[in-house]
Amino acid sequence: HLSNTFGAANGFGLKITSGANGGAASGHIGFYQPDGTNDGMISGSGGTITYGAFTGNHPASLPDGVDEYAYGTVMAITGTSSDSNSPKAVIYEVAPTTAADNQAVLGVYSNDAGFQLDDKDQHNIFAIGDGHILVCNGNGDIAVGDYISSSAVTGHGQKQADNIMRSITIAKATQAVSWSDESGTTKLISCTYHTG
């Protein structure tokens, strides 16, 4: 908890100064795993703050009786409500997509968020940034840069039929798939997320 007790209008709640003057990029805040592996950094240079790497998510509840889904599962909104403690916050209810080009898609399942809202376990649904998505061979091979929309295979995306970002667009592929080179018809690939 940070609190600014300085009464002036130009007081800071938190001020971080690092590095030397002169415009060179400075790493202000670093995020690390217990083993020292770097997860990301907030840095600045010449008046621009940079967040890298990042992935934005929305917390969401799953259908009753479901504990989790596979990482990369494509999830659609099935309902919304408000948190009784934070009435401006939206609580999403989600389930895996089951039809092609579902415009109710919220993002891609990541993991259990480790907290509850209104007595429902919350799970992280990736919506912007980068990560992975489960895809199938619907609409054919996937090239780097192809948009991904939902498919008829439960919880899987497929190559979108065109290259225009639409309400059905979930992601953009950053990994190519030639299905004739694969042993199956589904795969987890890297992507950037575009559902926001």
What are these regions (language model features)?
Residues 1-196:
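Extracellular receptor-binding modules and their adjoining Ser/Thr/Gly/Asp/Asn-rich linkers
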